[in-house]
C-alpha cells in the first residue's frame, strides 16, 4: 500500500482517535495526547461526512468536558488545528478552547 505523508498522518490520527474513543467509552479520563487525538479524529470524520468548517468549529467545543479529561488537560489544550479533506478541498479547521 502506497500512502502519501498526509495520508500517513491521517491514519496515525485516526488510530490514536480510536484508542482515545475506546478509553473515553470505558469511563477513563483522557490525557493530553488522547484528548487532542479524540478531537482531531472527530474533525476528520466530520469533514468526511460533509459537515461544514463552521459546524465543526462550533460542535468541537461540545465533544469533551473537563470531566472527560485528567486534571490540567483542559488548560493545556487552548486550540486544536487539523487539515481536513472536505468535498470541496482541504481546509484547516481550528477549534479554540475545545474542552469546556
Swiss-Prot record:
Pathway: Nitrogen metabolism; urea degradation; CO(2) and NH(3) from urea (urease route): step 1/1
Organism superkingdom: Bacteria
Keyword set, alphabetical order: Cytoplasm, Hydrolase
Catalytic activity: urea + 2 H2O + H(+) = hydrogencarbonate + 2 NH4(+)
Compartments where located: Cytoplasm
GO molecular function terms noted in the UniProt entry: nickel cation binding; urease activity
Assembly information from the UniProt record: Heterotrimer of UreA (gamma), UreB (beta) and UreC (alpha) subunits. Three heterotrimers associate to form the active enzyme.
Recorded family membership: Belongs to the urease gamma subunit family.
HAMAP family: Urease_gamma
Protein name listed in UniProt: Urease subunit gamma
Gene of this entry: ureA
